[in-house]
């Protein structure tokens, strides 16, 4: 086993991430910000103040993806599923940076209520992130 084993508790308000071999549990608001006039997406760790100052921010990403909703950010309309993908990409970078490892061997995600639509959304996200 060379890759990371990550556990994630994914909710509309906050996401908690733990990684085997790390003592830290990261808590991140389930929201994503986009820097104006760029393609740079960011999440904010609560321990770092949780601020996404100067950015357009979208939250409740699970609900948005589940209802096939959209959000307009910086004049561009994004599907909720796309925003969830960008959020997960950014959040998974946190344990990758902390461990110095890129490969994710196992990812376990818990959600408040398991629904078929949500499982489909998360499977699309895993494909996008190239996680088997």
What is each model feature region?
Residues 1-72, 127, 132:
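Early-domain small/polar-rich strand-loop-helix modules and first-structured segments
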Residues 3, 103-107, 122:
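Residue-level recognition of the N-termini of beta-strands and the immediately preceding loop/turn
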Residues 11-14, 111-118:
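Gly/Ser/Thr-rich loops at beta-strand to alpha-helix junctions
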Residues 53, 76-87, 114:
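Catalytic cores of large soluble enzymes that bind and process phosphate-bearing ligands
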Residues 67-79, 105-108:
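Short hinge/gating elements
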Residues 83-99:
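Phosphate/ATP-binding catalytic cores across multiple sugar-kinase/actin-like superfamilies
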Residues 96, 100-113:
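Short glycine-rich phosphate-binding loop at a beta-alpha junction
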Residues 116-131:
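Short, low-complexity, polybasic intrinsically disordered segments
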């Amino acid at each position: 086993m060379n890759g990371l084993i990550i556990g994630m508790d994914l909710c509309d308000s906050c996401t908690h991430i733990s990684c085997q071999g790390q003592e830290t549990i990261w808590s991140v608001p389930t929201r994503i910000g986009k820097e104006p006039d760029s393609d740079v997406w960011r999440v904010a760790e609560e321990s770092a103040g949780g601020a996404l100052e100067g950015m357009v921010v979208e939250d409740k990403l699970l609900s948005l993806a589940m209802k096939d909703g959209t959000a307009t950010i910086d004049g561009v309309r994004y599907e909720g599923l796309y925003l969830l993908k960008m959020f997960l990409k950014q959040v998974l970078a946190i344990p990758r940076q902390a461990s110095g490892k890129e490969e994710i061997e196992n990812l376990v995600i818990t959600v408040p209520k398991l629904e078929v639509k949500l499982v489909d959304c998360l499977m699309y996200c895993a494909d996008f992130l190239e996680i088997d």
